[in-house]
Amino acid sequence: MSKSKAKGTAAERDTVRYLQFYWPLAERRALSGNKDRGDIAGIPRTAGEVKAAVKIELAKWQQETLTEMQNAGADHCFLVIKVPYKNVSKWDFWMPAYQLGLEDLRFKDLKEARWVRMDFELGRDVLKGVIAALWAAP
């Protein structure tokens, strides 16, 4: 396994462990061909992507995450970016603003979605609330 692949696998593993506090069934998703559905499975109606790279390609990764959400047939998505030398709880956690109710779906294409960044600790709690609200909706 290459060094960069090993870093990515370790970041996914650490992300899953952190998410299992609320979602015990969270797990790394096995690769699934050309219709990638994200790196994380086991969170209801949600696709998760994890990145651990030296070069940050935020716009590209956000678009990948939205595509994976669509491929997975999910309602929500998130992107976790490992921050070197920080505890997993302080890694960057990104979600599209519309999923948080912060903007209307005024844009015609998901590519126009704006994103909100928070630390992973807050992001995990926010995601829990967003999913709970989804299940409580009539």
Task: List each model region and its residues.
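Catalytic phosphate/metal-binding cores of nucleic-acid and nucleotide-processing enzymes, i.e., regions
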Residues: 1-138
